Each structure stands twice: as structure tokens, then as C-alpha cells.
Amino acid sequence: MQSWQKPLVADFRSVVGEDQPVPLHMWDTASREVTPLTPSDEATVYVCGITPYDSTHLGHAATYVTFDVLNRQLLANGHRVNFVQNVTDVDDPLFERAQRDGVDWQELGEEQTDLFRQDMANLGVIPPTSYIGAVEAIPDVIDMVSTLLDNGSAYVVDDPTYPDVYADRTATPQFGYESRYDEATMEQFFAERGGDPDRPGKRDPLDSLLWRAERPGEPAWDSPFGRGRPGWHIECAAIAARYLGSHFDVQGGGEDLIFPHHEYSAAHVEAACGVERMADHYMHTGLIALGGVKMSKSLGNLVFVSRLCNAGTDPSSIRLALYAGHYRDQRNWSDALLAAASRRLALWRTAVETVHAHNDADSEARARRLVDDVRQALATDLDTPAAVDLVDEWAGSIVDKEKIWDLPGVDGKNAHESLSVPVPCAAPATDDKLSVAQGKITILDDGKDSEADAKSVELASATAGTQRCGAHSHASGELTVDLLPAPHQRGDAPSALYSHLSPAAALVAGCVDALLGLKL
């Protein structure tokens, strides 16, 4: 399956002029502690992909941006990265959505996968080395199920009508080590998350489906154990083992996949390949909430990346908003969060431009210290909040933030005749309205309130595709801001992305690009 176009990414080692790796320490769900992540020359990562419907909401984005940041730290340390990601393009939820909407399940899957690709490209996520659909992996699934049947780790239920194949959960004595849940919690999550504990003929309620015998109206493929289709967990197990082997560095995904999905996919690989532990690290992202309620397809309270981008939101603002919380925490998405990220991005861009215009030895020394500190923060369990704070501190020492936000019509301040410094492309969250047209932003103080979601999109739109602004005050009280193109819009090669900047500015912009995927 085709992935998406690779973004232009600054080469970190070329930017900083050194090749000294920084030791990585990442949280491991199985041990419940931060432990060293020590790949060989080739780092190996498997991240569970989407079931292609309702793509791409911010819960998805949070997960894939997180593992993109991990990918970038591995690359900065000089590793080759073998990054594998799947698409669950044959599964019950996909069939149910297609039936609800009256469309073909394959067409729905292809359409939503295309949308996901576009969203990942817009967010600047580095594409996986291998992007594999479950359908194309069915031969690998059949091979693994056959192995599990042959070595006694699986069995066929005694049902002449639907002879499904199940994994014996006792086949691996270490089963449960990843989630560390007790039996009652396992049974609860198994029932809630696609399991069938009450299926007649099973040896144990927690035995998981490997191969579902053909049912009327469902897709099916030939196999030595009858026509049917794969279970959910065996799909990822077969893909991971095929493209990464029986043991690799990181298995990742959202925390709702810890059990049953990741527990079982690891157990299937371990039982089929005779290994004790599939991955060195099991990493999981916290869930994203809207208004304090978890975003979910069932509740329908989803915020979509494509809608934000279509409204003009700078993708870097979306990434930066997600960085405000640690990837393992439960995070709440809000209009204010996105607006704050847009203002922060504008501040950083203005600081880079200011340093570019006034480069000196002290600026270069401070920029290099910043790069070292940001790298260390991210090497410590991807601590993006700490990294963001570090860049904030650096930018705040360069740009007079009081002057930056002292705009006509903002927060009830009086209009000024002129501004003494360039201003970022967004103002603080207020009731003022922004209009974007023909490469200019106009901030209007009409005294009227605006809806929170519209205000967020407008504020975020203000920095869309921009690097810095110049401001012009008018007697009418309007402030018109010229938008200048960001580096990623100029079509530069990765090695030349920041060659137009002074050494200090290039250090900061290149670091933020290479490590965080943000375009300054």
C-alpha cells in the first residue's frame, strides 16, 4: 500500500554540525517506568494504524505526531529507522459504518485512507518505511495462523457451521505482562473492545479470534482451515513479524490499544516465533478529550484535521497545540489551546527573523544551548512541554512580547500610530475578528462577540503558511498584516532549507524542524 509524500525535513546533523547521539529514555508500558531505548544501527518501530473511517480526528493525529517525534529523535541520533504502520482495512467497525452509510466497505476504506494520507502529509509526518493494509497481509496472516495451529497455540472451535479459529491464551505463560491488568480488568476490556467472551466452544473466555469462518454477506478468503477472514489482533502480529521480525524496538499506539489489541498481537508473535517478548518498549499515547469528554467515534465529538486545515489553520499550529501536553497524559483540546499555539508559533517565527537580522556570537551560543536543551528534553520520554517551554524562554528573551501583543483593537487597548517591531500573525484570544484575504490579515474591533470555534479557526488561520509579518496601522483602527511565505513553501531541498538564515537563526529553525516537525 502506498503511504504519502515525505516532507522536506532539515537534516539535524547538518544543521548542528555534529553527530553526537543523545541517549534516549522512553516509558515502557510493560515495566511501567522510563527505561533506556537502545536500538542497533537500525531502529525498528511498529505503530498501529487506523481503521479507515472517521479519518483523521485529533485523537489519531496525537498518536501519529507523537511517534513522528520519536522517529525524528532516532534519525537525529543517526539511526536508520525501519518504521512499519498498518491500515486495518478489513474489520467489523468498517463493515458496520459502510452498511450504515449505504456504501461499499472497500470504497469507504480507500476514501478514508486517502484522506488520512493527505492529513499526515499536511501535518508533516514522515511516512512509514512500510505501509501495509490488512487485506494485502492476508497471506502472512494465514501463515501465522497455520503455525499457531501446528504448534498447539491455537484450535478450531467445535462448530460445524462456523468453525472459527482461536488462540489459546495459555500458550504463552507470560500473557498479560504488557498491560499488567488483573483478570477482571482483562475480561471487562475484552468484552468492551471487540472480544467475544461468551462465544460457545471456546476453551477460555479470553481466547481471541484468529480466523473468522465465512458468514453470509462478509468478505472471505481461502485458507487451509476454511474460507474466512482475519481477526483483528493477528493482522498486526503477522505484519509486524513479516516486516520487522519476531523482536523489535518499539510497538506503539493509543492507550486504548494496550488491551486487548497490543497484548494479543504480542502474544501471537511470541507463540508463533518462540520468543519471550516481542518489543523492547511498548509505548502508548494518552487520549484526547473535547470539553472534558474523550473524543470518540461513538460519541461523535470529533475534531478533524482536514477541517482545520481547510479552514486555513497552519498545520504547525496543530502540532504545537498537541505538544502543550505530554504524550502520555490525557489532554483536552479546545479553541483556546489552538489559538495559543498559533500565537506561540508566530512569536517563535518573529524571534527567528529577529535573530536572523541581528546575528552575533552571543546569539549563536544561545541558539546552540537551546538546541542542546531541546534535544535533551525530547530524549527524556519525548517531553514536548519542556521543549516548548525552552523555545518560549529563548523567543521571549529576543522579542518584546508586550509590544508584540500591543495591537490596535486588541484587549480594548487604544490604537497606536505605528508599531516599532514586526508583529506575529495572530493576536491574543479576544472577541476581535480576523479576516484573511489576498495575503493580508485585518484585525477589526467592531465590539461584537464571535463564536469560540470560529474565533479559534480565524486566529489559527492568521499564521497559516506564514513566517513573519510586517504591520501597518491605519487611522480607521484596522491593522493590516503582510504575510510572508514560510520556508516549507519555497520548495527548498532539505540541505538548503535554512541556508538563507544567519547561523543562529538556522540553528533554531533547523532544530525545531528536524526534532519537532514545525516550520519556522
Curated annotation (Swiss-Prot):
L-cysteinyl-5'-AMP binds at C48, G49, I50, T51, T63, N86, V87, T88, W232, G254, E255, D256, I288. Disulfide bonds: none annotated. GO terms for biological process: cysteinyl-tRNA aminoacylation; mycothiol biosynthetic process. The keyword Translocase does not apply. Zn(2+) binds at C48, C236, H261. Its cofactor is Zn(2+). It catalyses: 1D-myo-inositol 2-amino-2-deoxy-alpha-D-glucopyranoside + L-cysteine + ATP = 1D-myo-inositol 2-(L-cysteinylamino)-2-deoxy-alpha-D-glucopyranoside + AMP + diphosphate + H(+). Binds 1 zinc ion per subunit. A motif ('KMSKS' region) lies at residues 294-298. InterPro entries: Cys-tRNA/MSH_ligase (IPR024909), Mycothiol_ligase_MshC (IPR017812), Rossmann-like_a/b/a_fold (IPR014729), tRNA-synt_1_cat_dom (IPR032678). Pfam families: tRNA-synt_1e. Monomer. Belongs to the class-I aminoacyl-tRNA synthetase family. MshC subfamily. Catalyzes the ATP-dependent condensation of GlcN-Ins and L-cysteine to form L-Cys-GlcN-Ins. This is L-cysteine:1D-myo-inositol 2-amino-2-deoxy-alpha-D-glucopyranoside ligase. It comes from Corynebacterium kroppenstedtii (strain DSM 44385 / JCM 11950 / CIP 105744 / CCUG 35717). The lineage of its organism: Bacteria, Bacillati, Actinomycetota, Actinomycetes, Mycobacteriales.
